[in-house]
């Protein structure tokens, strides 16, 4: 949530910053701004609205200088308006700050600073940081000391980049519970909240850890511990993504591109975990209880993982949303449990907090993560990468299916260790890319279905067993990007209440592959049909055609693999509904790609 970009080097800073902010738009924002420094003077342009509009309206690109910072804001403290947009300055106008996160004690600090004569212009928590640094600079006379003293006073979460007019060849950065990355160029440096912001210039990156601050010039950087001031040694990561992977490549939207990238992403996930999955499976064998956690789509992947691991590993699995686990499981976590944490970005605030809690309780942690070098990968004892590549669309698509692939590989290896026959899924896994590709070939048919359903205001998705999470994920996609009410339900629950909501014309999407619950699903679909439901069924058995208004026939796969192939038409349905309604599926309202604040 929110985006940060900082630059120092030979280029015109405003050009680099505006380009970087555009590449961070997917994180969600309501206002934006940039600041540069030239000949000892700070120049600032900011306002509420979209970046392209602000560039024209406020002439962002006219700002001079080779050092600068930029920000896209998602309002937390203070309404989205020109004044509350970042960057923020102190009383002198010589200290300028951009910040992601929430300063929990900003009211206390603001009262203290008001008593000392500071004048505030905005309602944000961020402005407090600029004034606090100003106050400490008066005391110390030293930029680094003033910066670090201020950090020691802050409670909450932050990724910070600070520019001093009187120290115009260095940027000051810090991180606590919000991502910040240094991009290392040749005679230039970039700071950003996410990799795509600087991918056009460099693929060499350093990830700040929580509790670290740094000083960055165009040729060097130093990272230190906020508490002790000790210098930290940092690993430089070579990012495997290319700039082309983070662009639309001829597709109308990133989401559609990423849906169609799934065959390749799944292939990469399979072959990228050939060696790692067996090793992690052996680790899981040591434990008699496994907990899986995640948020949003990653939580739905966790639910699928529960079915897979219990079915093949014969070990009980608990699944809990990370936001609940960190508060409700504190007294349950112990070294007899293993935690699997699923997070696309590796920076999801609640998931990272749950991982930290587990580690503090002596729990071994396995991460299933897409972004190499992210915080989750540094907390986890073992990491399985999804190898999905950059996902720019806010609604998860290829990162979900690759998470499912990783969980399937892990469960398959567990099955081998406990003596379960896994030959059927083992033989089908290499065919998953072509099976998903066959689901993509019905894109035109799915669009026609979307046209028929475009006036519907309520949807119900139903599934049983391992297909229940697919119902949840399909409903989530409709909610996220088409802004239509949708519920994902366990089909067995229909008679326990939800059936009362089924009436003439309401779409009911039934996920019904051949498997041990198929006959029950067929009965549930017939029940919904008898109450007037408009039935859209997905399956491989022709009997579904007889009870459905629309039958989407998909290739027959082992039931354990159906969540991977069956979600694809539902992603396409949500996409086409969003486009038909005039919404941008890449940037749905009120949502952000990475939820890095709690």
Curated annotation (Swiss-Prot):
PROSITE patterns assigned to the protein according to its UniProt record, in alphabetical order: GATASE_TYPE_2, SIS
CDD domains: GFAT, SIS_GlmS_GlmD_1, SIS_GlmS_GlmD_2
Active site as annotated: 2 (nucleophile), 593 (for fru-6p isomerization activity)
InterPro entries: GATase_2_dom, GFAT, GFAT_N, GlmS/AgaS_SIS, GlmS/FrlB_SIS, Ntn_hydrolases_N, SIS_dom, SIS_dom_sf
Domain Glutamine amidotransferase type-2 residues, every copy: 2-219
GO cellular component: cytoplasm
Enzyme Commission code: 2.6.1.16
Sorted UniProt keywords: Aminotransferase, Cytoplasm, Glutamine amidotransferase, Repeat, Transferase
Residues in the signal sequence: none
Location of this chain's protein in the cell: Cytoplasm
Classification via SUPFAM superfamilies: N-terminal nucleophile aminohydrolases (Ntn hydrolases), SIS domain
One biological process term in Gene Ontology: carbohydrate metabolic process
Reactions catalysed according to its record: D-fructose 6-phosphate + L-glutamine = D-glucosamine 6-phosphate + L-glutamate
Keyword Isomerase applies: no
GO MF annotation terms: carbohydrate derivative binding; glutamine-fructose-6-phosphate transaminase (isomerizing) activity
Span of domain SIS: 280-420, 449-588
Subunit annotation: Homodimer.
PANTHER family listed in its UniProt record: GLUCOSAMINE--FRUCTOSE-6-PHOSPHATE AMINOTRANSFERASE, ISOMERIZING, GLUTAMINE--FRUCTOSE-6-PHOSPHATE TRANSAMINASE (ISOMERIZING)
Role according to the record: Catalyzes the first step in hexosamine metabolism, converting fructose-6P into glucosamine-6P using glutamine as a nitrogen source.
Protein name per UniProt: Glutamine--fructose-6-phosphate aminotransferase [isomerizing]
Designated gene of the protein: glmS
